[in-house]
Amino acid sequence: MDYKKSLNLPDTPFPMRGDLAKREPGWVAEWEETQVYQAIRAASRGRPRFVLHDGPPYANGDIHIGHAVNKILKDIIVKSRNMAGYDAHYVPGWDCHGMPIEIQIEKKYGKHLPVTEVQSKARAYALEQIDRQRKDFKRLGVLGDWHNPYLTMNFSNEADEIRVLGRILEKGYVFRGLKPVNWCFDCGSALAEAEVEYADRVDPAIDVAFPFTDRGALARAFGLDEVDAGAIVIWTTTPWTIPSNQALNVHPEIDYALVRVTPTPVHGPLLLLAQERVEPSLKAWGLEGEIIATAKGEALEGLRFRHPLAAAAQGYDRTSPIYLGDYVTLDTGTGVVHSAPAYGIEDFVSCKAHGLADSDILGPVMGDGKFVDSLPLFGGLSIWDANPRIVEALKLAGSLMLVQKLSHSYMHCWRHKTPVIYRATSQWFAGMDVKPRDGGPSLRESALAGIDATAFYPAWGRARLHAMIANRPDWTLSRQRQWGVPMAFFVHKETGELHPRTVELLEQVAQRVEKGGIEAWQSLDPRELLGDEAELYEKNRDTLDVWFDSGSTHATVLGGKDGVLGGSHGAELAWPADLYLEGSDQHRGWFHSSLLTGCMLYGHPPYKGLLTHGFVVDGQGRKMSKSVGNVIAPQKVSDSLGAEILRLWVASTDYSGELSISDEILKRVVESYRRIRNTLRFLLANVADFDAVGQAVPYGELFEIDRYALAMTAQMQAEVQGHYERYDFHPAVSRLQTFCSEDLGAFYLDILKDRLYTTAAGSAARRSAQTALLDITQTLLKLMAPILSFTAEEAWKVLAGSALAKQADAPRVTIFTEVYHALPPFADGEALTAKWTRLRAIRAEVQRKLEEVRSAGAIGSSLQAEVDLYANAADHDILASLGDDLRFVLIVSRATVHADADDLRIEIAASGHKKCERCWHWRPDVGQDADHPEICGRCVSNLFGAGEPRTRA
């Protein structure tokens, strides 16, 4: 007889190989065809709501690995919340306006298109990009309302954004003023703080002499009767700002020195600089000198010095006063700061505080980076080309003390990677320290309070965002672009004042935009709204900062507080969101702008929690770079290894820091996946012939080890659900992996094989095991589903078609309509866990001894061994309670327990009996049945009799 055929060998259509790259597109198509997302919504209706508001990616270019990380994390959270019993929608969004798309249109069609044509082509381009990105996001297994996303360029969103502008204007936050803002010459526009990045750059660093003018006043400041000719010396890394100099700054508490030097410079023998900087400065200039007098900086206030280019061109024949400034330091330079208020924030603030009118501020640099033609010596030159010319002119004028090359970190445009300057322009601002008209706290105050009330994951994000808000300048709302939501103001042609009915007019414009998009503003004749007043007013041509677009989506999409605005998806979502989740750069981006708009509109943030993930780097910790050749595209990983591997990599990695990825790292993830898949295959195969409705064993009648396995499963489920609740995904993955490999694979399933394969197919022993396995399988699949979505769905379909096929009440469209599995109550769970934890420790010691004996060649497999255990009273009771089932737990052919006062002692010997050809145990009763001499008595009973007596394992 072929006894192998008498075994209950497992079988399942769930294949060992995942073939993920080939099979996953089929699941994506099936989810689309069967409307899985809509099924989830129907199953979740009426539950407590959980809102994750999607930070919109920009609608330009293919998605990269950072996008994949972001969307996978969001998908894990939304799926886990739905399965935890919430109604968690996922409405994806896209950021559609702004410079990058405008640049693409310019590249393709040139720079001279009419505005309306730029806008129509930009809309079409954005839609193309969205379609490409949407396909890639869906390929990652991300479920969402992909057919109805929110787009910042949807007419309703554009209209509501104009309404938001009206509300913050009405509250008193918005004002117009001349201020230095981040300016990109290539963009031809102001930049937001989040659009500026820093990179190393080499610039000329120069020491420049400003000649004395009123020597009598200078002498009095230093307590002298008179002074010779000389100059005060400044240090700067921006020679191009020298033509715009209007003041000098010194620190009131720093000591400044008059130094007589040799050889004598062009402007005279005396130099004025901070006393602490005299020695290094003279050494750098190649001069000798002695200090003849000192004075505190405050004594120098109001003294005037001649412009260093006065000798080179008559247009510079002016003087600059000294103002006091606490920001002056002695780290570098001379302790004297040159001030060009049009090109520096501190310079601007200082000069304005001393009464300089906006109209008197010198701003010769145009928006394209060139000096105005009328500027003496340098008119028409770009500021960068002018730098060496200015240095040469200073030298000819006798005002150049030193020029050196300096490598330093400098502001650059994040799009063009070109240098950015501060440039004073007339812009619209949201005031950080303006008190709103209702008398409430300032924007800065309410934003800082809002940060304190927000949960941060990880916790360090709070201090980072707090520091940014505490130190940031006013928000520059306006941009000088074409593809953006208009700041739809009517401005008086003579006074520059807004129309007195601006808030009302903004609503009228919004109603038009709601029907025709921002193009409606372009085509609007002011007379339609202003009548005869139209002759007095002009349309403001500025557009809103794109960070205002995305930063106001909590109102335009979620509907705002109490749903006042309605919102494009206000019915599905709610304000405030439970969570915003983005990369760490968004502390100064979307998190930041959303906080400010929320606080301006409602006095507090639009979110309850902020989750931050790090950037992706390669295996060596380097940033992804095409030039380095270390870029890993998510599309390539999906097409070769499968998106499931990307999902497992994301979930396995601590996202709070940098996420490392490489081919080697992905290989390790593949191995982890295979082990999980093999566990699932074993589980599915061994419940394939089981009917959950008609064959399940009541909990109280389950074998002891099966009850313990369920107690283990319950503990694991509680831990993993807790990790999901706290957004700690890598510990969740680790716990699932440990459960599969150690709790199941190396322990429970290893022991269970004998009972599953050798007992009668319908026996209580086997059905007890299958009952436990089905609970374990359902628990495991549902816990894995948020992460391993494709695999969990594949396995769920197999389970639904076999063990669960007769359950009438269970929806079978998808695993994602399920909630976490409800395990039976465990009255004895704690006692079981304590007992079996000790049993597992003893078993591990037995396995170690068995391995020693096997290595010595005394036995082949562990089943050839007979074990005697000598144990103290407590251990003896535990071991003896299993009776003959102890041998199945230890996977040996005999296990005998002996009482002993000492600690555990284990003796192992090779069995002298024959091996059963069916169960492979070495037993004394092999051959005692004449009809079946090759098998043991247990197997004879299981095949032809009443079955073996067994209740523990």
Curated annotation (Swiss-Prot):
Question: Can you state which reaction this protein catalyses?
Answer: tRNA(Ile) + L-isoleucine + ATP = L-isoleucyl-tRNA(Ile) + AMP + diphosphate
Name the positions where Zn(2+) binds.
916, 919, 936, 939
Tell me a GO biological process for this protein: isoleucyl-tRNA aminoacylation
Q: What is its main location?
A: cytoplasm
Q: Motif 'KMSKS' region at which residues?
A: 623-627
Q: What EC numbers are recorded for this enzyme?
A: 6.1.1.5
Annotated residues that bind ATP are located at: 626
Q: Which PANTHER family match?
A: ISOLEUCINE--TRNA LIGASE, MITOCHONDRIAL, SOLEUCYL-TRNA SYNTHETASE
Know anything about its domains from the record? IleRS has two distinct active sites: one for aminoacylation and one for editing. The misactivated valine is translocated from the active site to the editing site, which sterically excludes the correctly activated isoleucine. The single editing site contains two valyl binding pockets, one specific for each substrate (Val-AMP or Val-tRNA(Ile)).
Job of this protein: Catalyzes the attachment of isoleucine to tRNA(Ile). As IleRS can inadvertently accommodate and process structurally similar amino acids such as valine, to avoid such errors it has two additional distinct tRNA(Ile)-dependent editing activities. One activity is designated as 'pretransfer' editing and involves the hydrolysis of activated Val-AMP. The other activity is designated 'posttransfer' editing and involves deacylation of mischarged Val-tRNA(Ile).
Q: State what protein this is by name.
A: Isoleucine--tRNA ligase
